Amino acid sequence: MSVSKKPMVLVILDGYGYREEQQDNAIFSAKTPVMDALWANRPHTLIDASGLEVGLPDRQMGNSEVGHVNLGAGRIVYQDLTRLDVEIKDRAFFANPVLTGAVDKAKNAGKAVHIMGLLSAGGVHSHEDHIMAMVELAAERGAEKIYLHAFLDGRDTPPRSAESSLKKFEEKFAALGKGRVASIIGRYYAMDRDNRWDRVEKAYDLLTLAQGEFQADTTVAGLQAAYARDENDEFVKATVIRAEGQPDAAMEDGDALIFMNFRADRAREITRAFVNADFDGFARKKVVNVDFVMLTEYAADIKTAVAYPPASLVNTFGEWMAKNDKTQLRISETEKYAHVTFFFNGGVEESFKGEDRILINSPKVATYDLQPEMSSAELTEKLVAAIKSGKYDTIICNYPNGDMVGHTGVMEAAVKAVEALDHCVEEVAKAVESVGGQLLITADHGNAEQMRDPATGQAHTAHTNLPVPLIYVGDKNVKAVEGGKLSDIAPTMLSLMGMEIPQEMTGKPLFIVE
């Protein structure tokens, strides 16, 4: 019989940042005896999870995709946001052959160029500056029919902040003398990632048929009407923007459709509705043969043009484990399963040799403030069983609660979420110690520690740019190093496991064995 393994466990408490101020801080307000005791009695440090330290622009808040890529890569990975900013600044973007090719083909055939994406300055799934650059590219290349389909944010930005962005684009189109915003809809519909196809269908119909529940002459009028219906940006219902005398912006065969989101997880479903011949999420009322361009690759099995294909990462933590014949488990709920698998593996969809995966279904509720504990009890049960199984050299687990409940902006629910996590951490730490394993507890970015925006007084539903905790639980006598970042975690784990760190990993171990 094989020797029982003593696992190195990484628990990622999604959205669990560190903030000294107590006001509007769900983590401080929650009763967390377990985390308090670990912080007081175990080796610990604070690490950076935002901005330049994770390959984002300076002071840009972190997010789950970026966080997990850096965690798994063991090096700073320059994100699509930063890469695109640079390309636009030096004008390489305006010569991108995939983007220019799609625009030119549509223009030469007298067809429309449709641009869609999350119109947001949040920088998590997209950035409105990139969308503006795409509008300029289409106009510069002589396209006459340019239609922008704006997905509204209110999640990575304040809940009612879309008006200034929409005005900026209205002014741009007026200055160009061509093109217009053709539709607005909340990301709740257009950017679902949990197979809630009834939501996606509403966005698809709006785009393909130019039909929605509402119509307005201007974007601001459409937005104000939504606010009057008590819909924040995220939840704005399908609204056609079309003044009298303006042509219909329904999509037709041969049109170009450029999707300007750079983050994959919430871009996949609506992309599949356009691209997959065998799509069965809902019965499409109109199937259009558009020239579809993904800004980045949303999934390897989506067969359509990609403007910025992924740069491959060699010797990520998962790949290095496989090369060294180690066994590993990835486990999370639906909401963060892609993060501990695809993103942690550097954008690789397939599992590595010796890598098992467990997916726990997230609860089917409209918003997670209705069930702040989410599926954490079942997740913990499965995680504890895996720790005690003796099968795994390493286990990577993500608890989504701090982030998903933090996004609702409901303080009371976020406190409950954090308290549920404290019980989970207790069970996990006990299990790890009972088998002589090691445990690192950290987060990928902040969220729940800031539940109200002090400037506006509105609920703070976005991530933060604050540091996150890192705690060591285990039998090794270790000393914490200050000044770490997410990309130091993989080298830290390898070091604690007594393994060589591959040269591609430029991060440094944050716990030194004394």
UniProtKB/Swiss-Prot annotation:
Keyword Manganese annotated: yes
A Pfam family matched by this chain, by name? Metalloenzyme
Which pathway does this polypeptide act in? Answer: Carbohydrate degradation; glycolysis; pyruvate from D-glyceraldehyde 3-phosphate: step 3/5
Q: Where does Mn(2+) 1 bind?
A: 403, 407, 463
Instruction: Name the Gene Ontology molecular function terms of this record.
Output: manganese ion binding; phosphoglycerate mutase activity
Known catalytic reactions: (2R)-2-phosphoglycerate = (2R)-3-phosphoglycerate
Q: How cofactor binds (record note)?
A: Binds 2 manganese ions per subunit.
Q: Which domain of life is it from?
A: Bacteria
The first-level EC class reads isomerase
Which residues are substrate-binding? Answer: 125, 155-156, 187, 193, 263-266, 336
UniProtKB keywords: Glycolysis, Isomerase, Manganese, Metal-binding
EC number of the protein: 5.4.2.12
Looking up PANTHER family in the UniProt record yields: 2,3-BISPHOSPHOGLYCERATE-INDEPENDENT PHOSPHOGLYCERATE MUTASE
Q: Which family does it belong to?
A: Belongs to the BPG-independent phosphoglycerate mutase family.
Q: Which NCBIfam families match?
A: pgm_bpd_ind (TIGR01307), PRK05434.1-5 (NF003897)
What interactions and quaternary structure are annotated? Monomer.
Q: What is the name attached to this protein's record?
A: 2,3-bisphosphoglycerate-independent phosphoglycerate mutase
Native organism is Escherichia coli O6:H1 (strain CFT073 / ATCC 700928 / UPEC)
Q: What gene name does this entry carry?
A: gpmI
